[in-house]
């Protein structure tokens, strides 16, 4: 499963993140968008592990409260639904 995720992350574009965020009512400014893109590209393994709190702390410092809350909600939702696959 991790190879499949890695291949997806390798192909992920900043526009993919922008479209996904808008679809989920998350309005990111360019700085936030770049930060999330770089975080996903560089730290996706940590996000998929049980040691993801460090990454969430970084997000909290670099996103608006509203965007952070929405992203954390989605993160936990998908972690709960699909975490068993990892």
Describe the residue ranges of each PLM region:
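Long, compositionally biased
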Residues: 49-80
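Short acidic DE-rich linear segments
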Residues: 2-3, 79-86
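N-terminal acidic leader/helix
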Residues: 5-35
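Amphipathic alpha-helical segments that form the core helices of the histone-fold
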Residues: 34-45, 57
